[in-house]
Design a protein with these regions (language model features):
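Substrate-binding pocket helix/loop in short-chain dehydrogenase/reductase
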Residues: 97-98, 105-108, 206, 210
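Short, small/polar-rich loop/turn modules that mediate ligand/substrate recognition or access, typified
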Residues: 173, 178, 240-242
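Active-site loop-to-helix junction immediately N-terminal to the catalytic Tyr of the SDR YXXXK motif
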Residues: 101, 147-156, 167, 195
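Residue(s) in the substrate-gating loop at a strand-loop-helix junction
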Residues: 141
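Short C-terminal tail/terminal secondary-structure segment
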Residues: 146, 229-230, 241-254
Length: 254
C-alpha cells in the first residue's frame, strides 16, 4: 500500500474532490481525518470509507476559524498520534467583477482559500516536523495562473495558494516536509454545478461547455484529481517539492 498507516488530514472532504481523495487514500492504507464544515457530507464520506474497510474519522471543521482548525488538529493527534500528510482542499467559491465584490465577499474567499490553508499548515506543523516523510498537498486550480472574466475573487485566492506552495516548499524543506499543489481544471462536482447555476446554464449544457476547452473534450472526474494528489503525497514523489501538477485534460496547454 502506498500510504500505509499515513496519518492524514483532508479538509473539505465532503462530496466532490475531497471525498474522492479521502476514499483513494484509505484504499492505499491511510488513516484519514475527514475535516468538513457540512456534517452530513463529512459523515457520509466516513460512512463510505468504513463500509469499504478503510480507517477514517469525521471532524466538523470551519477552516475560516483558527480555533476550529486547532480543534481539528488536536482531535487528529488524539486519535492517530500524529500527522504525516495534510491535504488542503476546503474552498469558498466566490465569483464576480471588481464592482460586484465587496468586503464580505473578499473576506469569505480569502479566509477559507488562503488564510485557512495557511492556518491548517501552521497548526499541523509541529507534528509534521516529527514525521519522517511529511507531505502537504494544496488544492489550487488552473485559475491560479490563467485569467477568466468575472472570476476575480476566486482566481486571486488561488493565485495566492500557488505562491504559498512555492514559499512553503522553500521554508519547510529543512524539515524534510514536501509541499506541492494540484491544479484541477474543469471537474464535474457539486461546485461546478453551482458555477453553472451562476452562469444560468443547465447542467447538461454546462458539462458540454466546460469540457470543450480540454483537448480530451470532456470535464474531469474527482477520482482523476485524487490520483494526482495520491502521487504527490506518496513516496513516489519523494524528490518533488514546490511543484504544481496540472490536471485539466490539456485545456491550458497553450
Amino acid at each position: 500500500m502506498r500510504l500505509e498507516n499515513k496519518r492524514t488530514i483532508i479538509t473539505g472532504a465532503g462530496p466532490g474532490i475531497g471525498r474522492a481523495i479521502a476514499e483513494r487514500f484509505c484504499v492505499e492504507g491511510a488513516n484519514v481525518m475527514v475535516a468538513e464544515i457540512e456534517t452530513q457530507g463529512g459523515e457520509e464520506t466516513v460512512k463510505r470509507i468504513l463500509k469499504s474497510g478503510g480507517t477514517a474519522i469525521f471532524q466538523q471543521t470551519d477552516t475560516s476559524k483558527e480555533d476550529s482548525i486547532q480543534c481539528m488538529v488536536e482531535c487528529m493527534v488524539s486519535e492517530f498520534g500524529g500527522i504525516d500528510i495534510v491535504v488542503n482542499n476546503a474552498a469558498a467559491f466566490v465569483f464576480g467583477s471588481i464592482e460586484e465584490t465587496g468586503p464580505e465577499e473578499w473576506a469569505k474567499v480569502l479566509s477559507v482559500n488562503v488564510i485557512g490553508y495557511a492556518n491548517t499548515i501552521k497548526s499541523a506543523l509541529t507534528f509534521l516536523k516529527k514525521s519522517k516523510n511529511a507531505a502537504i498537498v494544496n488544492i489550487a486550480s488552473v485559475s491560479s495562473f490563467i485569467a477568466q472574466p468575472e472570476f476575480l475573487p476566486y482566481n486571486t485566492s488561488k493565485g495566492a495558494v500557488s505562491q504559498m506552495t512555492r514559499c512553503l516548499a522553500m521554508d519547510l524543506a529543512k524539515y524534510n516536509i514536501r509541499v506541492n499543489a494540484v491544479c484541477p481544471g474543469a471537474i464535474y462536482t457539486r461546485a461546478s454545478e453551482q458555477h453553472m447555476d451562476f452562469m444560468g446554464l443547465d447542467h447538461e449544457k454546462g458539462r458540454e461547455l466546460f469540457g470543450q476547452d480540454a483537448l480530451l473534450k470532456r470535464m474531469g472526474r474527482p477520482d482523476e484529481i485524487a490520483n494526482g494528489v495520491l502521487f504527490l503525497a506518496s513516496e513516489e514523489a519523494s524528490f518533488i517539492t514546490g511543484e504544481h501538477l496540472v490536471i485539466d485534460g490539456g485545456a491550458t496547454l497553450d
